């Protein structure tokens, strides 16, 4: 599948290709990144990010997040009554959710590693 590293894209479960996962990474699925919002974390356009399914992540961890049917990859920060999805590129604004908006945000899993696309 694919995940946005920029503006969220429609979340679809599909197999695009099979990838070899490095032996030291324990994951449930992988996604191809599209965009440049996570470049300062070392995740670039077309990189493959490995996701371990879990409904929560620690403050500041990178996660695959579904927002009202769309998916994005961001650092997650929790504050009382607020969830912030923070890009790792100053060209992008944080995505801040409060109150009823929080019901639309679902952590799909934690990014446990990634490999760079060479092409």
Where are these regions (language model features)?
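Well-ordered beta-strand positions enriched in small/hydrophobic/aromatic, beta-favoring residues
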Residues: 31, 63-65, 85
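Hydrophobic beta-strand signal
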Residues: 48-51, 64
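Short acidic low-complexity segments
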Residues: 51-58
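Short aromatic-glycine motifs in intrinsically disordered, low-complexity regions
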Residues: 65-66, 93-102
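PDZ-domain C-terminal substructure recognizer with occasional recognition of PDZ-binding tails
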Residues: 72-96
